[in-house]
UniProtKB/Swiss-Prot annotation:
Signal peptide: none annotated. GO terms for cellular component: axonemal microtubule; axoneme; ciliary base; extracellular region. It comes from Danio rerio (Zebrafish). The lineage of its organism: Eukaryota, Metazoa, Chordata, Craniata, Vertebrata. This is Cilia- and flagella-associated protein 53. Pfam families: TPH (PF13868). Belongs to the CFAP53 family.
Amino acid sequence: MLTAQRSRIRCREITGPAHSVALKARPPLSRDIDDIFVRRRKQEATRGEVLEFTKDQSSCDVRMRWERNTQRRVVSATVNRHLQDALDQYQMGIDEKRERLRELLESEELELFKEMEAKKETVLERQAKMHERAKTLRERRESERQRVVADKLDQLFREQSEELRAVQIKRRQDQVCTERESQIRTKEEVRRVQEEEEKLFAQMWESDRLAKEERHNLELQRQRENNLQQKAVLQTQMDMAEQQRIQAKELKQEEAQLLKDQREMLRLEAEREHRQKLQDQEKRRKQLDLSLRLKMKRLTRDRQEELALDMSILEQLLAQEKDEKQDEVLKKLERQEEQRRYREYLSQQLEEQKRLEAETEQLFESELQQAWARREAQWRLEKTARDRLMKDVMDTLRLQIQEKLNENMQKQAEAFKEKEELDRIIQANKLLDEEEKAHFREATKEYQADLLAQMMYRQRIREAEEAEKEYEFQKGLMYEEQYNKKIQDILSRPISSTTAVHPFRRRDRRCSSSGGQMS
């Protein structure tokens, strides 16, 4: 605070343009005290407002906190109540289930006890069953022993009988030859079936390839026809667009010419009105000039007549005076009296003449005014007729121009609509073209994928056939080797009744049995 006061004291010094320093006047102390008091009052008022606002804010915060806590407690109580109700219902459901299960368990236990009571056996019955079971086991064991003894005796007989061994060997050789022939015949049949299948697959492949090539060619032909048709349609649309552009240009030129004609008509109408106004002003000026000239002519004529009359009177008087110089003096007075009376009479006549001329002038003016009024009325009627005719002509011309403008605007609107329709058709054709191209690309991809799948399928079939042939060949070699080993083994050991049947013989037996069942 002191530093600020010192800075304010230093700031009282002001340097002038020369090497001199001036001091500002010190403000009065009363103003500072009043300012301090006012500032302090303002600060106290502001502090009071802040304290009041803080108190209100704190009370609002307390109230809001209490309301939030109350709302939270209410919500918590509601949730707890709903939860307790749900738990009570769940507990009631569990209790009911427990009661039902307990009743079901009791009923099942009772049924089980009843069944056990019903199935309870005595000791004598159990001993009788055990003796029966032991007897059955002894009989089964004795029958198995007898069958084994019979097999051993039969095997011993076959081993000791040379004739039986020779017959069996001969029979087995015949059977092996028959089975070999059957195997060869089966291989031939399998090879024939495979060849027929290959031919069938080749025919199907060729027919499918030809059909797909035909479809592809038809699709290409249809695509070319569609392209040519779309090209023709686009050319037609371009020609129509060019015609519409030329028509729109002509319509704009016609509209510009119509607007120019309308402006020229307005200019001519304004020029006609201006010329009519000038003509009216000229007519009015001519009327005023004519009336002024007539009035000036009349005044000039009156003055000339008065001057001529005065000159004639003076000449007569002078002549009479010259003649009367020789008369008597008495007659002079009489003549003067007569001259006075004559002058009075002349003045009266002059006044009467002026009055008559005034009346004549007035009549002339009235007749002239009537004539001018009639002429003006006639001119007004003619002007009204001309104006009406000109107005009709202008209205007709304006109506024609407006009709042409409306027709031009309608043509432009129709041309715009046709252009929009043409643009829409072009866009639709473009979309159709894109869809057809996409469909063609998709069909081409599907065709390629189909061809590739068929090639892979044929390759897999060929590989599977080759693998199956190789497997059959290896299997045949293995069977032949096993067969030879088995022949050698059979020839080298005694013949038994438990000899395994060859797979081909077993297959032939199964085929013959199935054929018999089918028949």
